[in-house]
Amino acid sequence: MFDIGWSELVLIGVVALIAIGPKELPGVLRMVGQWMGKARKMAAEFQGQFQEAMREAEMADLKKSFDEVKEAASGFAGNNLMTSLQKDVSDALRVDALDKPAETSSTTAIEAPATSSEALTTPTTPEAPTPETFVEAEAHAAVNEPLAITREVEQAPVVAQDTAPSEAIKDAKAS
């Protein structure tokens, strides 16, 4: 603490022995030791209070951060989030609205099939494209966006080709 070496301690001891005297020296040393103990206790108490204040400040910061997160999370209440997700899913599932041309206001109601046999006889493969379909696709806002194209593949016999590849393979390689 004071960076005192052995030679300095010996010098202080000799001066104290001469100044105080051998008779009163043990009492003075005891009193100095008690003062040193009190000073150490006070320093430890101050350090403990300082650390406690730092912990309280950290806890206040953590509580403030927690309250901010809690407040932000309250905006995402279960009903609001689920309603938003359900709306997004229902919008994404409205493929029929994108596939059909715009209808007039008089034919906007969706009609249910008259009998259950009509619902069973609907084809699962799409109809062949008509020129109106291409016009509608070009007029759509997402005409330049990539599409996921799927098709039904029929099993065809494998024919060995000794000549140039067919047009289908050329198209597949080009894309």
From Swiss-Prot:
Residues 100-132, 155-175 are annotated as: Disordered. The chain crosses the membrane at residues 1-21. One of its GO terms (biological process) is protein transport by the Tat complex. InterPro entries: TatB. Its main location: membrane. GO terms for molecular function: protein transmembrane transporter activity. It is found in: Cell inner membrane. Residues 111-132 have a biased composition (Low complexity). The keyword Transcription does not apply. One of its GO terms (cellular component) is TAT protein transport complex. It is a single-pass membrane protein. Gene3D superfamilies: 1.20.5.3310. Keywords: Cell inner membrane, Cell membrane, Membrane, Protein transport, Translocation, Transmembrane, Transmembrane helix, Transport. The Tat system comprises two distinct complexes: a TatABC complex, containing multiple copies of TatA, TatB and TatC subunits, and a separate TatA complex, containing only TatA subunits. Substrates initially bind to the TatABC complex, which probably triggers association of the separate TatA complex to form the active translocon. HAMAP family: TatB. Belongs to the TatB family. Part of the twin-arginine translocation (Tat) system that transports large folded proteins containing a characteristic twin-arginine motif in their signal peptide across membranes. Together with TatC, TatB is part of a receptor directly interacting with Tat signal peptides. TatB may form an oligomeric binding site that transiently accommodates folded Tat precursor proteins before their translocation. This is Sec-independent protein translocase protein TatB.
